Each structure stands twice: as structure tokens, then as C-alpha cells.
Swiss-Prot record:
Span of the signal peptide: 1-19
Lineage, broadest ranks: Eukaryota, Metazoa, Chordata, Craniata, Vertebrata
Coiled coil residues, start to end: none
Expressing tissues: Paneth cells of the small bowel.
Propeptide regions on this chain: 20-58
Protein name (database record): Defensin alpha 4
Subcellular localization: Secreted; Cytoplasmic vesicle, Secretory vesicle
Record-level GO BP terms: antibacterial humoral response; defense response to bacterium; disruption of plasma membrane integrity in another organism; killing of cells of another organism
Key words, A-Z: Antibiotic, Antimicrobial, Cytoplasmic vesicle, Defensin, Disulfide bond, Secreted, Signal
Annotated family: Belongs to the alpha-defensin family.
Record-level GO cellular component terms: extracellular space; transport vesicle
Segments for region (Disordered): 23-42
Function (record text): Host-defense peptide that has antimicrobial activity. Exhibits activity against Gram-negative E.coli (in vitro). Probably contributes to the antimicrobial barrier function of the small bowel mucosa.
Gene designation: Defa4
GO molecular function: phospholipid binding
């Protein structure tokens, strides 16, 4: 009888050990932010000579990014990139 109880306990423990990593992984993905959610940057290129000339004149020497949500500290909004992104450039 003792052997049966011990064997059952070991089997239950083995199942619990296998189930815990799956639960932890699910919980981590729910609570953690998606990688770079706030730091998503999108590269933008302007087509044609006129677009690139205007872009170079107004933003010469600046490194600007399309960010989701809000700009980082030290940056300001210079426009939008599509519907959900802000065009953020360093303050001058």
C-alpha cells in the first residue's frame, strides 16, 4: 500500500513539473511587453528627387524614427508615419 501511494505521488510530481514550464511561459508572454513594443522603429524612404531634397534640407544630421505610441525623452513629434506611428526626431 505504501508503495502505491509513493508511486502515485511521484507520478503526480512528474506531471506537475512538466506542466509548470508551460504555465510559466504563458504567464510571461501575457505580462511581459512584446519585444520593443515602445521602441519599434520603421525605416522611411522618400521616393523621387524632390522628396529626398526636402527631407535632407529640413532634417539634415538628424536621426528620426517612426515610433509606436509616443516619442522618447529628448525627441519631439515631427509628423506621422501611417496611422499608428509618430515620426520622432531629436530636439534642436
Amino acid at each position: 500500500m505504501k508503495t502505491l501511494v509513493l508511486l502515485s505521488a511521484l507520478v503526480l510530481l512528474a506531471f506537475q513539473v512538466q506542466a509548470d514550464p508551460i504555465q510559466n511561459t504563458d504567464e510571461e508572454t501575457k505580462t511581459e511587453e512584446q519585444p520593443g513594443e515602445e521602441d519599434q522603429a520603421v525605416s522611411i524612404s522618400f521616393g523621387g528627387q524632390e522628396g529626398s531634397a526636402l527631407h535632407e534640407k529640413s532634417l539634415r544630421g538628424l536621426l528620426c524614427y517612426c515610433r509606436k505610441g509616443h516619442c522618447k525623452r529628448g525627441e519631439r513629434v515631427r509628423g506621422t508615419c501611417g496611422i499608428r506611428f509618430l515620426y520622432c526626431c531629436p530636439r534642436r
